[in-house]
């Protein structure tokens, strides 16, 4: 038949079991930002970073309102250049007498002096104390064979020895002497001849016979062996006092003592004998132009002139009369021929005039050198310190020399410098203490001729030269070799930072001041405290100044 209508919905069935997990869905869109989280705990300190590069120098800050404490004294600065000459001040009032200065520091240890002469023999010394007994000496060598000694006395009988062992059977002794004839026996009956009997045994030895005569002297026996070393005998008696020994050799030269204070000036010596005539001096400078001389007398009449060609009438009113050298005479000048002027001669005269002016008023330039810095100052006392040209021998200016003029302190010093005047702070090696003989050393030379130097000395009464000794682990024990090949020490110490042999670089500032101007400038120097390990030195030689 036809299907009937749908029935009513039935009641819900029981819940089925859970299904299997589905596949992961696609990623959803980003959510909204969450709220800020709470602050985290502080982390551990990181490792220190590398030092950053130095930043740029900041701008100078404003002056503080509080004055800072004075800083520690800085190290000694380098020796500065002489400052410019200041204006001459007014004369001050005499000051009060100064207090006595403190004693100067002890000078550096000097070099060992020369060995002195042998001293006179001293008096004999007191007898010395008894010496202790000496140790036994070593066994001596075997002496030579001695002579045979005399026969000694007979010794005492020895004690009876123990019974000896039975000796081996002795050999048959010699036949004994015939015995005494026995008493005649009774005649026996004749027996039958018997067989030969066996040999009888040796009889017992007989008693010892009397001592025989002494035998002949035996031959000398061989030398016996060296006996054992004897025991040490008792100490001998004290011997008599020995004679004084010879003087011992001179001991080594002791270290030089510290330099003593300068002695008092000695009395003026007697006038020396008159010296021999010196060598001819150089030509003097060209003198100033002299004043015009007076008119000389009229000369003799000249020889007759050639015959003229007739009388020339000259108007009386000629406007060119010329005064004759002879007083009261007038002659008239004719028409002279034109002549060429030698312009070269005029230039020479002008040049000579300039040279004369330079000689009269030198300016210290290469074309106008002065004799010395002193002369330059006399020409213009406002001249400041600096380098100038001088020509001490006053000859051709081609050998003029450039020097430093020091006008500070009221003296006019002419100073010349060494062409190479410094050495670095380092260890110097060599077999000599003189700097010029060391590896890399050199002699101090000066760019000035001997002639010019002699004229500078001749015009000077004093000379001074400074020296800077740079040190590390070395004391400034320095001597100098002068131009006349003498050895001198510094006699002025401004500062000595080397006396304690510092392990860090330091310096000593010394100088040589002398009235023996021929000793300067210094040509070499030596240091006696450079032989140890880690010792270094350097130097700077200042200019030699004459005044």
From Swiss-Prot:
Task: List keywords of the entry alphabetically.
Answer: Collagen, Extracellular matrix, Glycoprotein, Hydroxylation, Repeat, Secreted
> Key word Ribosomal protein present in the record?
no
Glycosylation sites per record: 381, 406
Compartments (UniProt record): Secreted, Extracellular space, Extracellular matrix
- A Pfam family matched in the record: Collagen
Q: Which family does it belong to?
A: Belongs to the fibrillar collagen family.
Please identify the protein, giving its name as recorded: Collagen EMF1-alpha
* UniProt source species: Ephydatia muelleri
Traced from the root, the source organism's taxonomic lineage reads: Eukaryota, Metazoa, Porifera, Demospongiae, Heteroscleromorpha
């Amino acid at each position: 038949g036809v299907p009937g209508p749908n029935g009513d919905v039935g009641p819900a069935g029981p819940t089925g079991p859970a299904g299997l997990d589905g596949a992961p869905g696609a990623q959803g869109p980003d959510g909204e930002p969450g709220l800020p989280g709470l602050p985290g705990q502080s982390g551990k300190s990181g490792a220190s970073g590398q030092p950053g590069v130095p930043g740029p120098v900041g701008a100078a800050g404003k002056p503080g309102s509080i004055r800072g404490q004075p800083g520690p004294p800085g190290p000694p600065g380098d020796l500065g250049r002489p400052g410019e000459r200041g204006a001459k001040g007014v004369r001050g009032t005499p000051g009060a007498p100064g207090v006595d200065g403190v004693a100067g520091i002890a000078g550096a240890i000097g070099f060992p002096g020369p060995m002195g002469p042998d001293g006179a023999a001293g008096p004999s010394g007191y007898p010395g104390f008894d010496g202790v007994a000496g140790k036994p000496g070593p066994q001596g060598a075997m002496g030579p064979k001695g002579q045979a000694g005399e026969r000694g006395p007979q010794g005492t009988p020895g004690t009876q020895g123990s019974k000896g062992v039975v000796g081996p059977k002795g050999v048959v002794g010699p036949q004994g002497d015939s015995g005494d004839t026995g008493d005649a026996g009774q005649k026996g009956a004749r027996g039958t001849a018997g067989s030969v009997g066996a040999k009888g045994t040796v009889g017992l030895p007989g008693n010892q016979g009397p001592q025989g005569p002494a035998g002949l002297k035996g031959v000398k026996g061989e030398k016996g062996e060296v006996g054992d070393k004897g025991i040490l005998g008792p100490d001998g008696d004290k011997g008599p006092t020995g004679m004084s020994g010879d003087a011992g050799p001179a001991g080594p030269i002791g270290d030089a003592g510290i330099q003593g204070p300068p002695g008092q000036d000695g009395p003026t010596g007697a006038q020396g004998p008159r010296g021999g005539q010196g060598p001819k001096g150089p030509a003097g400078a060209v003198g100033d132009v002299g004043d015009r001389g007076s008119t000389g007398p009229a000369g003799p009449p000249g020889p007759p002139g050639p015959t003229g060609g007739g009388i020339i009438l000259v108007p009386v009113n000629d406007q060119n009369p010329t005064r004759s050298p002879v007083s009261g005479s007038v002659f008239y000048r004719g028409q002279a021929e034109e002549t060429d002027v030698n312009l070269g001669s005029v230039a020479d005269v002008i040049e000579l005039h300039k040279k004369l002016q330079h000689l009269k008023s030198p300016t210290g330039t290469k074309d106008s050198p002065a004799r010395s810095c002193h002369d330059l100052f006399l020409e213009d006392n406002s001249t400041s310190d600096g380098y100038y040209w001088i020509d001490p021998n006053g000859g051709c200016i081609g050998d003029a020399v450039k020097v430093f003029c020091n006008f500070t302190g009221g003296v006019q010093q002419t100073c010349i410098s060494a062409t190479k005047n410094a050495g670095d702070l380092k260890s110097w090696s060599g077999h000599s203490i003189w700097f010029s003989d060391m590896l890399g050393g050199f002699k101090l030379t000066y760019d000035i001729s001997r002639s010019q130097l002699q004229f500078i000395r001749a015009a000077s009464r004093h000379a001074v030269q400074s020296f800077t000794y740079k040190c590390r682990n070395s004391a400034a024990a320095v001597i100098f070799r002068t131009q006349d090949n003498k050895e001198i020490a510094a006699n002025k110490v401004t500062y000595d930072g080397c006396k304690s042999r510092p392990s860090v670089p330091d310096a000593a500032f010394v100088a040589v001041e002398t009235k023996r101007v021929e000793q300067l400038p210094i040509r070499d120097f030596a240091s006696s405290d450079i032989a140890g390990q880690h010792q270094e030195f350097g130097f700077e030689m200042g200019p030699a100044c004459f005044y």
